[in-house]
Amino acid sequence: MMAIRELKVCLLGDTGVGKSSIVCRFVQDHFDHNISPTIGASFMTKTVPCGNELHKFLIWDTAGQERFHSLAPMYYRGSAAAVIVYDITKQDSFHTLKKWVKELKEHGPENIVMAIAGNKCDLSDIREVPLKDAKEYAESIGALVVETSAKNAINIEELFQGISRQIPPLDPHENGNSGGIKLGNQSLQAGRRCC
């Protein structure tokens, strides 16, 4: 039987870049042309094999509107990974991405895996952000970079597979600490009671 690891992943980025569409495509293999903006955050899960483990992604899709920005730390706190999404047809969304990365580096978990997703690559004829720029920036911060299209299901699975590969495997010899909770029978000492 394969071990299941729960990995909290948050998606960050401007409103309208396609965060919810990426999550829907990954989890449900569905694209909604009329998707509404996320209010606060939404949550979905999907389990995928990775080596001799199963990774259960606990995906928090955060709202991109400025008024919800202050809620973001609540979602990326304790995350194993963050996907920062920008729209390849909107240069401003790439600049905002850098603010998210700065915030993650200052306030996020120390060893968080970062992935940059340049979404809407199906619209490359109206591209404003060259892939070269995204690759150079990703390399400078030690992040994965993938161009995706939630609409056409391009590189969505590859994005999450890349994150899975960056997560260090559990060390079963590490003092028995697997990052989980140990459950077992505990006998009460004579004369000691709970309350």
From Swiss-Prot:
Tell me which cofactor or cofactors this protein depends on.
Answer: Mg(2+)
Q: In which tissues is it expressed?
A: Detected in brain astrocytes, spleen and intestine (at protein level).
**What is an example of a GO molecular function annotated in this UniProt entry?**
GTPase activity
User: Which InterPro entries is this protein grouped with?
Assistant: P-loop_NTPase (IPR027417), Small_GTP-bd (IPR005225), Small_GTPase (IPR001806)
Per UniProt, GTP binds at G16, G18, K19, S20, S21, D32, H33, T38, G64, N119, D122, A150, K151
Q: Which family does it belong to?
A: Belongs to the small GTPase superfamily. Rab family.
Subunit structure, as described in the record: Interacts (in GDP-bound form) with RIN3 and GAPVD1, which function as guanine exchange factors (GEF). Interacts (in GTP-bound form) with EEA1. Interacts with NGFR. Interacts with EGFR. Interacts with OCRL. Interacts (in GTP-bound form) with APPL2; interaction contributes to or enhances recruitment of APPL2 to the phagosomes; interaction enhances Fc-gamma receptor-mediated phagocytosis through PI3K/Akt signaling in macrophages.
Which PANTHER family does its entry note?
A: PTHR47978
Name-wise, this protein is: Ras-related protein Rab-31
The coding gene here is Rab31
